[in-house]
Design a protein with these regions (language model features):
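Structured, contiguous alpha/beta core segments that scaffold functional sites
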Residues: 7-8, 12-14, 149-324
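Short, hydrophobic/amphipathic alpha-helical patches that form generic packing surfaces
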Residues: 67-83, 280-298, 457-461, 482-486
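C-terminal anchoring/interaction modules
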Residues: 1-35, 39-40, 46, 306-537
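Generic signal for short, ordered secondary-structure residues
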Residues: 98-102, 126, 267, 341-342, ...
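Short low-complexity stretches enriched in small and charged residues
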Residues: 98-105, 263, 315-320, 369
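Long, contiguous amphipathic alpha-helices that act as assembly "spine/axial" helices in icosahedral shell
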Residues: 104-151, 272-308, 344-378, 385-419
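Extended, helix-rich architectural segments
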Residues: 1-210
């Protein structure tokens, strides 16, 4: 059975490799112009990492003459990481689902807020922030791939790994999301492999030598078995490590969640890998790069022109060098011409800066990274800057929705699964049933802030028509404070619950009634201010 599974997995892996190799030239072009210092595709083809060529320390960006797209890609990644998962902040909030009864909702939300604290306590301690930026750099071009491994200790339960784009491949399943991942490890030290996969089985043909470091090639494969159900989920995850030369199954385990996470910013229907914003802007970047290259070549010819020379018995064109303060011995011909003359210029390329700036603006518009006006620009106002930022956020909203589905969902599932196995996560039960944890991402939190602002505008509208005193009758005031706290992601422990607010409001009403009665008994006309400043009612 193991041999059959290995043969089947190797066949699937080779098919996925062939599919990704079809993207090789497009990846090469896009990485070259958007991330020149991360472009491995010029040095080694897909599927040959890193045995074909070692690029460590090499200058792989010398052929890029304009860095507009490279800078825009950096800004795009920085902005999206700061917007969706900023370092040191709780950018995600666990909330109760619609199945929870209203009387239990506040209690459950407080418990879930404590789970949020536990989640970020260990996430911020891990290397997540170091890895997520690298993955989003790949997502800017096509697809980001992250591995979430279980740590060795309870103090550090998470280990995150970014995967090089040339050595990981994926397959889409029947639900339109990735359900199989293949990661190549070429020339991996055997000692490192044994740490990565405990109880790793040694391939049959491998012999360890104390004098030499043993290097090995392994295929790391994870796929979803849709025939094995896991509760209401479509299938369990099968994790395998295979030695391709001997077809040895070196390691295996079954998981409830996926150790690999792959996400795309946007994609074309029917394709496996994404087409990110950098891929959209690469045409303009390529035009600028070629234009500047042509201008540099043209300027070189103008500054250092080519010369034609012929031998006149004194001057030898085969061994002369044009060096300042050098005397060239030559004899003029009878016609008075010299044996050395510059080649006439055959053409002159002059690109207008206006055209180049228009192309740069196209790149910034595609990447939503238009630079802000200078601080001392008299034409720029604070309102203009705020509106531009808001427009960029709205334009990225569709991208954020896909990231929320393909990245945040699997990430939270995997991290909770690891915390549960480590004994660091307590599940919540209501009426004897385990509730499923739901969460709000920064996109939802931003929408919540907008809803609170809209509510305040409505309150001001009602107050303007009916007056401040009468406006409170239009709302369930005991619900406003908890509602706004949830929308603004405020700690619920410092917010009074609805029953407490109702009791407090009732006490205020009773106090008003008592003061009115006392004023009436003392003969004070209604509406006359008392010593405490309250009017008799």
């Amino acid at each position: 059975l193991a041999e059959t599974e290995v043969a089947w997995l190797l066949k699937r892996r080779n098919a996925a490799l062939t599919k990704k190799q079809m993207w090789g030239s497009l990846f090469q072009k896009t990485y070259r112009l958007s991330q020149p210092n991360r472009n491995v595709f010029d040095m080694r083809p897909i599927g040959q990492n890193p045995g074909t060529f070692n690029i460590q320390g090499m200058d792989i960006a010398w052929y890029v003459f304009d860095l507009t797209l490279a800078h825009a890609t950096d800004v795009w990644c920085n902005e999206i990481v700061n917007a969706l998962c900023p370092a040191g902040k709780k950018w995600l909030n666990f909330v109760s689902g619609t199945a929870i009864r209203d009387e239990k909702r506040d209690e459950i939300n407080e418990l879930l807020q404590k789970r949020t604290d536990v989640f970020f306590k260990f996430l911020h301690r891990s290397n997540f922030q170091l890895v997520v930026h690298e993955c989003f750099m790949d997502a800017a071009v096509s697809t980001g791939f992250m591995t979430v491994n279980e740590g060795a200790t309870k103090q550090d339960p998470f280990v995150f790994v970014s995967n090089p784009p040339d050595c990981i491949y994926a397959d889409e399943g029947p639900y339109g999301v990735f359900d199989a991942y293949y990661r190549d490890w070429v020339r991996l030290p055997w000692d490192t492999a044994r740490v990565m996969w405990p109880n790793l089985i040694k391939p049959t043909n491998m012999t360890e030598n104390a004098d030499d470091e043993v290097l090995i090639t392994l295929y790391e494969i994870l796929y979803r078995d849709h025939d094995v159900k896991d509760g209401n989920k479509p299938g369990a995850w099968k994790y395998r490590v295979i030695h391709p030369d001997t077809r040895t199954l070196c390691y295996k385990r079954d998981d409830r969640t996926s150790a690999f996470i792959g996400w795309r910013v946007k994609k074309l229907a029917g394709e496996t890998y994404g087409r990110g914003p950098a891929m959209d802007a690469v045409a303009a970047a390529g035009t600028i790069n070629q234009a500047l290259y042509d201008e540099i070549v043209s300027a070189n010819f103008r500054a250092l022109p080519m010369y034609m020379g012929f031998e006149d018995g004194v001057f030898n064109p085969n061994n002369f060098k044009m060096i300042p303060n050098t005397i060239l011995a030559c004899a003029p011909t009878a016609s008075g011409t010299w044996p050395l003359t510059a080649v006439p210029a055959a053409g002159d390329i002059q690109w207008s800066m206006l055209i180049l700036n228009e192309l740069r603006d196209q790149i910034n518009n595609i990447m939503h990274t238009n630079p802000l006006p200078a601080m001392d620009d008299p034409k720029a106002t604070a309102t203009e800057i705020l509106k531009r930022d808001q427009r960029n956020i709205e334009n990225r909203a569709a991208q954020d929705a896909r990231i929320q589905k393909e990245f945040f969902g699997p990430l939270v599932e995997r991290c909770i699964d690891i915390l549960r196995r480590k004994g660091l996560w307590d599940d919540i039960t209501v009426d004897g049933e385990l509730i499923e944890v739901q969460f709000d991402t920064p996109l939802v939190t931003s929408q919540g802030q907008t809803e609170v602002i809209e509510m305040l505008q409505h309150i001001q509208f009602v107050q303007g028509i009916y007056g401040t005193e009468a406006a409170s009758a239009f709302y369930n005031t005991e619900k406003l404070s908890p509602w706004a706290a949830r929308k603004l992601n405020v700690d619920l422990e410092v917010i009074k619950k609805e029953p407490e607010l109702l009791e407090m409001m009732q006490q205020v009403e009773d106090k008003k009634a008592q003061m009115a009665q006392q004023a009436q008994e003392q003969g004070v006309p209604e509406g006359t201010p008392t010593q405490n400043g309250a009017a008799g009612i």
